[in-house]
Each structure stands twice: as C-alpha cells, then as structure tokens.
Amino acid sequence: MHEHEKRVLEGLLFLSGDEGLSIEQLNGCVEELNKKEIETVLDELMQDYLADVHGIELVRFGGIYKFVSKEAIHPYAQKLFSSTKVATLS
C-alpha cells in the first residue's frame, strides 16, 4: 500500500547503520508524512521483514528503528568476524 514510502524509509534506515533513526528524525527527512503515517509504514516494513526470505529484520529499541541480522544468521556472522580478525592479525 505504501510502497514508495516504504522504499524511502527503508533506504534512510539502511543509511543510518547501527545508530538507527527515530520517528522524529525520519519525519524531519520525509515531511510529506506525519509521525503517525511514518509509524504505520514502519510497522508494515517490520512485518515485511519478518518473512523467512530475509536475513535481516527491522526492530525498534527505545524509540529507535534499525535493521539487525536475524538470529539464524549469527553463526555465520561469528565465522565472518572471527576470520576477519585472524586475517588482520597475521
């Protein structure tokens, strides 16, 4: 329903990285949506990313929305980061 808005918010959240963004910050960038509309679109995005086809999900921590890897990815991430450390130390 809100496909354009989803793409915009998704892109902004991706760019924000680990810090994530609040509804207020998103509202400052996407002025054509009010805070309630932004919250609705974020809820839709959260539902979209719950599908098993995605390795990431959209979460909210203390009013901040951000993308994180799903728990099923964590063993692979451990291998990635442990091999990266070994490679940089040698």
Language-model segments: which ranges?
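Conserved phosphate/pyrophosphate-binding and hydrolysis machinery centered on Walker-type P-loop NTPases
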Residues: 2, 31, 70
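Hydrophobic residues on short alpha-helical segments
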Residues: 10-14
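Short basic alpha-helical hairpin corresponding to helix-turn-helix/winged-helix-like nucleic-acid-binding
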Residues: 45-90
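Short helix-coil-helix linker/hinge
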Residues: 2-7, 87-90
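Alpha-helical structural context
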Residues: 29-30, 48
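Short capping segments at the starts of secondary-structure elements
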Residues: 15-22, 33
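Short amphipathic alpha-helical interaction segments
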Residues: 33-44
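A short acidic, leucine-rich amphipathic alpha-helix
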Residues: 23-28
